């Protein structure tokens, strides 16, 4: 019972809809994840309309969707706090778009959410790199972001061969394989500068698949 874990009630904070205010900068995605994870019967037993609660956070998440279809975590806040006559120009971020769409996935039966997800997927397709991977910031392939895209596709029941996410014959799974290093596992970033005779100074890499840590 999430309402009684070691004497703590983890449901109460989720009902604080003031955190979904237009000028708030909370992690709205996490609220949607948590709301969806609680059995509807639990909400009813607490006299809370889970759907209405989720709708308020959905509205706030959708406010962060930029004109290019992507998501920027501060776009909604910037629009809400802009001075009269001020134009806010937002640009989608790949990691933030994937995160937002993942949070919205459980609510895609709602028409407005489904439309937002489609726009977000169109954005992600447009910024996918030539080898099928995705970047974090800039144009450098990133293993962690590419893996999160694979997870999103699974949540949305999108085939790995969906033509929107195949670039030059490379699927997202093909791209993920390029981040595998023998003896290490999967790494996030190949952008490492170090003398070849001093590999001990290379940073520790996180294996996003196995949860292991190692160095080259």
Model regions: which residues?
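An alpha-helical repeat/solenoid feature that recognizes helix-turn-helix modules
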Residues: 1-2, 20-52, 67-118, 129-165, ...
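Alpha-helical repeat scaffolds
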Residues: 3-18, 51-54, 169
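Generic hydrophobic, aliphatic-rich segments that mediate packing or membrane embedding
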Residues: 7-10, 27-30, 57
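Alpha-helical scaffold repeats of the Armadillo/HEAT/TPR superfamily
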Residues: 9, 57, 120, 166-172
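Structured C-terminal portions of repeat-based eukaryotic scaffold domains
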Residues: 172-178
């Amino acid at each position: 019972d999430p309402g009684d874990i070691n004497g703590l009630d983890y449901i109460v904070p989720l009902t604080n809809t003031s955190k979904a205010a237009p000028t708030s900068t909370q992690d709205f995605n996490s609220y949607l994840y948590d709301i969806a994870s609680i059995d509807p019967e639990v909400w009813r037993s607490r006299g809370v309309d889970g759907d209405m609660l989720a709708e308020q956070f959905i509205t706030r998440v959708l406010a962060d969707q930029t004109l290019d279809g992507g998501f920027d975590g501060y776009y909604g806040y910037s629009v809400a706090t802009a001075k009269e006559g001020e134009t806010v120009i937002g640009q989608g971020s790949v990691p933030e778009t994937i995160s937002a769409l993942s949070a919205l996935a459980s609510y895609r039966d709602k028409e407005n959410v489904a439309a937002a997800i489609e726009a977000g997927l169109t954005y992600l397709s447009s910024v996918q790199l030539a080898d099928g991977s995705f970047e974090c910031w800039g144009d450098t392939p990133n293993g962690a972001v590419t893996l999160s895209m694979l997870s999103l596709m699974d949540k949305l029941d999108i085939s790995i061969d969906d033509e929107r996410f195949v670039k030059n014959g490379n699927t997202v799974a093909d791209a993920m394989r390029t981040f595998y290093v023998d003896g290490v596992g999967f790494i996030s970033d190949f952008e490492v500068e170090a003398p070849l005779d001093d590999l001990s100074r290379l940073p520790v890499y996180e294996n996003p698949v196995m949860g292991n840590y190692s160095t080259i």
